[in-house]
Structure formats: structure tokens, C-alpha cells
């Protein structure tokens, strides 16, 4: 049986390490499943599989295709699928439609969103619909054009405070897990 968000939260409470890796295909997922607590199907497949410079060209259909392949190889780890660029930013209703489609098609346990304060209502909407949300803060590759590339985050006290405040707000509004990327 796959790990639930409650299992991950219990591990955190018990100060256990959570091993998380990324997979894009059945074979990789099958190999790493017994060594991981959390497997992400990342929109980084745009870089790794499609040879693109950024993750911005990845579609919901791409995520479903790779998510389903990975899902077939995951028996124990928690499976999380990235919500690609512009699949959740336009409205909470659009986010719910796309997240529901991803969860139903891939049998994943959660979806991951790169968040800002603007996406907090979307986290609430998904959580209220029974879709566990992993909130991604800090270096968010979907903001590539905003930052002028992949720029390290959290270098200043102001940026550190922003990331911490955003993380707490996400958790308060229904995010099951928060991932911080530097």
C-alpha cells in the first residue's frame, strides 16, 4: 500500500527522514520504489525527456502520460504529480478540473503546485475537494522568466522571511506537505 500524506506527516512528527526522488517512467519507478517514501513525477520532464530549456512547455497530458507510467511501478511510496505551468494559475476552478483529471488518470496521492500568495485560494479549493496538495516554495522553475533563469532563493533575510511566511500560509490553508527548494 502506498504511503499517504498522513504517513508522511507522521514521519515528520517523529523526525524521520523522508526520502524523495523523481521518476518519469515505469522502470525507474519500479527500481526506486522500495527505497523511497515519496516519488514525484516532475514537470522537469520538459528538460529531461523533451530536451527543453525550461519546464514551461509541459502539458497536463504530458504529466498524465508520465504519471501513469510511473504509477504502474509504484507500490509503496507516496506518488505526487506536478501541476504544469498554467494548469492552475488562471483560476481555482481550472486547477480543480486539471488536478482531478491528473489524480483520476494516474492514481496519484497528491499534486504539487509551485505557489505564491495568489495560489492560496487554489490550495484551499483542492484540499476542500479531497485532493492533497504539496506546496512548492522557494526556487520555482515555472517562474523562470520572472527571475531571468534558475536563481537561488533564500539568500536574503527578506526572501527567507517571504518563503517562511508563504510556507506557513500554505499549511494553514490546506497544504498537506510543503517542499522548499533553494
Describe each model-derived feature in a short phrase.
Residues 2-182:
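Alpha/beta enzyme core
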Amino acid at each position: 500500500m502506498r504511503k499517504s500524506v498522513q504517513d508522511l506527516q507522521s514521519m515528520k512528527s517523529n523526525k524521520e527522514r523522508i526520502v524523495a526522488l523523481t521518476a518519469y517512467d515505469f522502470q525507474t519507478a519500479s527500481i526506486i520504489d522500495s527505497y523511497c517514501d515519496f516519488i514525484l513525477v516532475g514537470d522537469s520532464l520538459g528538460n529531461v525527456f523533451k530536451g527543453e530549456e525550461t519546464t514551461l512547455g509541459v502539458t497536463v497530458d504530458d504529466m498524465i502520460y508520465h504519471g501513469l507510467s510511473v504509477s504502474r511501478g509504484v507500490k509503496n511510496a507516496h506518488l505526487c504529480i506536478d501541476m504544469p505551468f498554467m494548469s492552475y494559475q488562471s483560476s481555482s476552478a481550472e486547477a480543480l478540473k486539471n488536478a482531478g483529471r491528473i489524480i483520476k488518470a494516474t492514481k496519484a496521492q497528491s499534486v504539487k503546485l509551485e505557489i505564491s500568495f495568489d495560489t492560496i485560494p487554489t490550495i484551499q479549493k483542492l484540499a476542500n475537494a479531497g485532493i492533497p496538495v504539496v506546496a512548492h516554495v522557494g526556487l520555482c522553475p515555472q517562474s523562470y522568466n520572472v527571475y531571468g533563469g534558475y536563481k537561488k532563493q533564500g539568500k536574503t533575510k527578506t526572501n527567507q522571511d517571504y518563503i517562511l511566511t508563504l510556507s506557513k500560509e500554505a499549511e494553514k490553508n490546506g497544504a498537506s506537505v510543503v517542499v522548499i527548494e533553494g
